[in-house]
Amino acid sequence: QFLAALKPELEKLGISEVAYFHISDEPSREQFDSYKAAKEAVEKDLEGYQMMDALSDYEFYEKGLVSQPVCAVNHIQPFLEKRPEKLWGYYCTGQYVDVTNRFIVQPGYRTRILGTQMYKYQLDGFLHWGYNFYNAEHSIFPIDPYRCTDAAGAFPSGDPFLVYPGADKEPEESLRIMLMDEAMSDLCAMNYLEELAGRDVVMECIEPEGGEKVEFESYPRSIAYLVEMRKKVNREIEKRMK
């Protein structure tokens, strides 16, 4: 009944083509049969709509249960080796060793490197759940995000929200959303340079000969690398704009 009522509203709003449905976050092998049953229960009703799920277990994609996986960045390697037609990445609370994330405790380069990684590995999108979650886990009670940044101890600080509630209900930026903006700006600049000069030129800026490779668990660990890399990209763009 819900889907039958929802679909006409999506059409009316003109967003049905950009709407995504999902069955369950991070299904495990123990949940294979129940996930399959849940998907089959709604598959006919969602025919023609895009479906995706957060996923770490390649078997769900390999057996056709998840056609568009959104992979945890610390489990993405099998998906890169046998790549789906569309591949998104994500991080949340479990991605705290080595890989990019946006926790308050982490240095800024670990947040900003995401844009460079997305370009190199040609990810189609990126997902994170927490923009302005100002509650304890399960929304049992509200919290003051200026005093509590971890959903009352449920998640690492920085995971539940990227902006603070400001005056007149306008969002106040955090340093982390500024770093995310820089990451996406890096990605846009790289894509633009690729249009002008080709992918090889961009990759030479990212991984100059003799330099450290950019991977998901191993990458240059300094903001200086990112600043210099972006300067190289900008210079290459400027050369072609004259």
Language model: regions and residue ranges:
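Catalytic domains of carbohydrate-active enzymes that cleave complex glycans
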Residues: 1-32, 40-56, 139-242
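Catalytic-core regions of glycoside hydrolase
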Residues: 1-140
